[in-house]
């Protein structure tokens, strides 16, 4: 979501234009199967036709039938920025016991509060390739959010996916692959919602760069122009799995998609999300990402956050009272409002939040116990705002396990690692130490001082404590000398047996904060180490015979200046470790655990290895067009197609031991005797309501009502005057209709046609620890599709993975991976359906420890062989 900075709010929200998105002219060439702009799709499909949601929708619909116009509208509109304890909150319905729903960040912990856990972010979780940890972290996030009284925790993030290596918020997601994002995201959702908290999957969709994601005084926000097949096979894939997991809410992105704003893009929200994917929850805007009133409601937006209009902090809104007016004058059908309110309440009921769910016991606006209840109001009533509830439990154990099991060993010449406790160590780099100003001194982590634990922005969290690498190493070794500086000391001595450990990092974040010339994206730093980190490594390599590099990074980095230097014996990527930075690292450095992390992205030799189309768009004026001309070929898919050997491939990661893959087998589980899945079932019934425009009195101010200045209400001063005027007609978009559609052939359930998720093949492989130390291995399964499908496909696509338990030397474990029909399918842009090779003929499945290190080949119809 957006930041809480008042300065940012005023500067960035002023210039929004209110033009219809369909009015933008397309001035660039497009593929024949692409859309110049998102075509219309109306009306918004009703929710409630999925059997698993039937009980929740029945409860919600009974309530909505008895609610007034103002009560329904109140559910859909935030109360305004700084008008409550959370990042945002909806209006309440006291008559039915519906509280303000607290919507709060974030994806790695409860933001701007106390006694919380600062977990490792998504990119670190992805590097573990550990499904159990992915779900466990989700459970812990849910427990902490619920414990603080958060109704909707704004995560996980599966967009951006990492199309652009310099992208500022890539670290919030799980890696540069749709299946990795999908598996990690859906397991996170399952864990979070098992606690009764509502998860919010974001940012929908194609939000791959921070710079120009929103309009400025001189530049309109960019449009992500992506063709239909690429959208389905890359960017939609993780959202589909999140919907299949039953996610209760979704956040629309700031950017346009095919020249239509994400929050009022009827093709994306009505057609693809709510009809094709069968999404049953509610869609909210990102903060100040709702750019219109009627257009957004008709296009499928259900909640406007934080509620304010084009000029925040003045108490106006595109929705709120204006939505009440639009209902009374018939511009927005009552049917649409009923569905909006029902979707919100259905999610509330589905997660059991009607059963003694706690109210917010914190304030994101102050650390004081008492203060204004509505900080955005000049004359706010005051009261207790912080109860300092400790929600940490034993979640530090999970946080440490994730940070530890994500650590990725890239190089280990002469087996210099693990270290011995009596080794003579010289430690260099500020990244080993703490922020001298305090671990939480920079708002939303908007600085790069000390060890890098997370990126900056609304996806960050306050650290309850921080164990730095310096502290952890000093606790273990009495032979360590620390030089916490980014300039190599001229007077340092180097003994023949000394080992230099150099800590460097690369940072990024959200664009409302600029850090050292980087406005979110890594525009200034590029993929290089910050604070002259590359020079620090080279200086150490000139002085010492043995150098170990520890890299904390948000994503891909360049290492060519020093990776092949003879003294550089070992390289560890520790990603973003959160609060357990020190202990997780020493667990691996000193050999209590073998490293078992794998790269969730490719590390290139040069930025020129990437296609030009994934560079940051830095156009200074006008409307920015970001054309996804690379199609399906991002990250490792591109490197393979272009024949470029990266420095380290996707999925790469060494261990202190070795593993053998053997005794693989493949067995068919369900029929693939047709190219397309079995036809979908018709939609089930949905709640029915009166479509009559309600009495104007339902939008009138209650008598003797005590208004709070700037608080956004659904009431009208003159509701009778809002009635329809036959002389004025609203200019509805092309294709507008109020007739419900039967739904696309690719739909039929949450995530799409249920037949897509039939298990087509089960693959087993035995993994044996053949080394001398205990450790864990990751089996990665990549699919190669045959040419018979008639379309170009990437040579290998990750579709599944499993991680072993800790295996003792000589110990084995059999891993099972299931491959669905969808895993073997391509999106047919003509049929508008998923197409698989009949009987799986010609499909190859490769199993290995990275995309470039294959150990087993399984061919459908032929069996498996060890390579």
UniProtKB/Swiss-Prot annotation:
Q: Which GO cellular component terms, listed alphabetically, does the Swiss-Prot or TrEMBL entry include?
A: extracellular region
GO terms for biological process? cellulose catabolic process
Annotated metabolic or biological route of this protein:
Glycan metabolism; cellulose degradation
Its keywords, alphabetically, are: Carbohydrate metabolism, Cellulose degradation, Glycoprotein, Glycosidase, Hydrolase, Polysaccharide degradation, Secreted, Signal
Question: Where found in the cell?
Answer: Secreted
What is the annotated signal peptide range for this record? 1-19
Name the glycosylated positions. Answer: 66, 74, 258, 329, 361, 396, 422, 475, 660, 725
Is-annotated flag, keyword Plastid? no
Question: According to its UniProt record, which reaction does this protein catalyse?
Answer: Hydrolysis of terminal, non-reducing beta-D-glucosyl residues with release of beta-D-glucose
> What domain of life does the native source organism fall in?
Eukaryota
Short name of any one Pfam family annotated for the protein:
Fn3-like
Q: Which GO-annotated molecular functions does the record name?
A: beta-glucosidase activity
What SMART domains does this protein's entry cite? Answer: Fn3_like
Task performed by this protein: Beta-glucosidases are one of a number of cellulolytic enzymes involved in the degradation of cellulosic biomass. Catalyzes the last step releasing glucose from the inhibitory cellobiose.
Q: How is this protein named in the record?
A: Probable beta-glucosidase F
Q: Source species, please?
A: Aspergillus terreus (strain NIH 2624 / FGSC A1156)
């Amino acid at each position: 979501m957006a930041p809480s900075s008042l300065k940012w709010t005023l500067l960035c929200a002023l210039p929004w234009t209110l033009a219809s998105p369909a009015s933008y002219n397309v001035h660039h060439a497009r593929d024949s199967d692409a859309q110049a702009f998102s075509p219309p799709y109306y009306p918004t499909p009703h929710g409630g036709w999925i059997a698993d949601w039937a009980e929740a929708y029945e409860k919600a619909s009974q309530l909505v039938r008895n609610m007034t116009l103002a009560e329904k509208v109140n559910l859909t509109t935030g109360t305004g920025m700084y008008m409550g304890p959370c990042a945002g909150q909806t209006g309440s319905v006291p008559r039915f016991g519906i509280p303000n729903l607290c919507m709060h960040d974030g994806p790695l912990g409860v933001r701007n509060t106390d006694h919380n856990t600062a977990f490792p972010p998504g990119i670190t979780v992805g590097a573990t390739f550990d499904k159990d940890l992915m779900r466990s972290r989700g459970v812990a996030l849910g427990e902490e959010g619920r414990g603080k009284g958060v109704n909707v925790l704004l995560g996980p993030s599966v967009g951006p996916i990492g199309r652009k290596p310099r992208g500022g918020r890539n670290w919030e997601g799980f890696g540069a692959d749709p299946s990795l994002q999908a598996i990690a995201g859906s397991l996170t959702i399952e864990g979070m919602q098992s606690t009764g908290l509502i998860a919010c999957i974001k940012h929908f969709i194609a939000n791959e760069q921070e710079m120009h994601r929103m309009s400025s005084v001189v530049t309109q926000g960019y449009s992500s122009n992506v063709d239909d097949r690429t959208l389905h096979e890359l960017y939609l894939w993780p959202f589909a799995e999140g919907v299949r997991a039953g996610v209760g809410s979704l956040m629309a992105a700031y950017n346009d998609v095919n020249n239509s704003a994400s929050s009022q893009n009827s093709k994306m929200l009505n057609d693809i999300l709510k009809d094709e994917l069968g999404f049953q929850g509610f869609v909210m805007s990102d903060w100040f990402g709702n750019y219109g009133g009627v257009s957004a409601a008709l296009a499928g937006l259900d909640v406007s956050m934080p509620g304010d209009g084009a000029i925040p902090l003045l108490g106006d809104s595109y929705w709120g009272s204006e939505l009440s007016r639009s209902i009374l004058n018939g511009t927005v059908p009552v049917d649409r409002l009923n569905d909006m309110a029902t979707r919100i309440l259905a999610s509330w009921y589905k997660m059991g939040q009607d059963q003694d769910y706690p109210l917010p016991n914190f304030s994101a606006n102050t650390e004081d116990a008492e203060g204004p209840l509505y900080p955005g109001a000049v004359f706010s009533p005051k009261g207790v705002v912080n109860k300092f509830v400790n929600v940490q439990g034993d979640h530090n154990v999970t946080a440490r396990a994730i940070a530890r099991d994500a650590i990725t060993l890239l190089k280990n010449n002469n087996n210099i690692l693990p270290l011995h406790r009596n080794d003579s160590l010289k430690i260099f780099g500020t990244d080993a130490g703490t922020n001298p100003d305090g671990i939480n001194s920079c708002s939303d982590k908007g600085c790069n001082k000390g060890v890098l634990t997370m990126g900056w922005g609304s996806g960050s969290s306050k650290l309850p404590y921080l164990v730095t690498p310096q502290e952890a190493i000093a606790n273990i070794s009495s032979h360590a000398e620390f030089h916490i500086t980014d300039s190599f000391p001229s007077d340092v001595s180097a003994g023949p047996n000394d080992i230099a450990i150099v800590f460097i990092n690369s940072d990024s974040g959200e664009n409302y904060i600029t850090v050292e010339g980087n406005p979110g994206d890594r525009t200034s730093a590029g993929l290089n180490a910050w604070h002259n980190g590359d020079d620090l490594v080279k200086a150490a390599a000139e002085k010492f015979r043995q150098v170990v590099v520890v890299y904390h990074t948000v994503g891909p980095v360049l290492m060519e200046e020093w990776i092949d230097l003879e003294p550089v014996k070992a390289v560890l990527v520790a990603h973003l470790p959160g609060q357990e930075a020190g202990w997780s690292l020493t667990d691996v450095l000193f050999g209590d655990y073998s490293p078992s992390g794998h790269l969730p992205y490719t590390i290139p030799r040069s930025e020129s290895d990437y296609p030009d189309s994934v560079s940051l768009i830095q156009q200074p004026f006008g409307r920015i067009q970001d054309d996804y001309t690379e199609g399906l070929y991002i990250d490792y898919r591109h490197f393979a197609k272009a024949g470029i050997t990266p420095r380290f491939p996707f999925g790469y990661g060494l261990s202190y031991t070795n593993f053998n893959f053997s005794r693989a087998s493949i067995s068919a589980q369900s029929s693939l005797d047709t190219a397309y899945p079995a036809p979908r079932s018709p939609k089930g019934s949905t709640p029915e309501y009166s479509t009559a425009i309600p009495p104007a009195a339902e939008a009138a101010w209650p008598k003797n009502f005590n208004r709070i200045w700037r608080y956004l209400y659904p009431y009208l001063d003159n509701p009778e005057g809002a009635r329809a005027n036959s002389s004025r007609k609203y200019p509805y978009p092309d294709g507008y209709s109020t007739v419900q559609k039967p739904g696309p052939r690719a739909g039929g359930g949450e995530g799409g046609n249920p037949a897509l998720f039939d298990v087509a093949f089960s693959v087993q492989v035995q993994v044996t620890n053949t080394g001398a130390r205990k450790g864990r291995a990751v089996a990665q399964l990549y699919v190669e599709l045959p040419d018979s499908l008639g379309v170009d496909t990437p040579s290998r696509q990750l579709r599944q993975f499993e991680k072993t338990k800790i295996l003792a030397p000589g110990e084995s474990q059999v891993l099972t991976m299931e491959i669905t029909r969808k895993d073997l399918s391509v999106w047919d842009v003509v049929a508008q359906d998923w197409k698989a090779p009949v009987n799986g003929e010609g499909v190859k499945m490769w199993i290995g420890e990275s995309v470039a290190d294959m150990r087993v080949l399984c061919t459908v119809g032929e069996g498996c062989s060890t390579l």
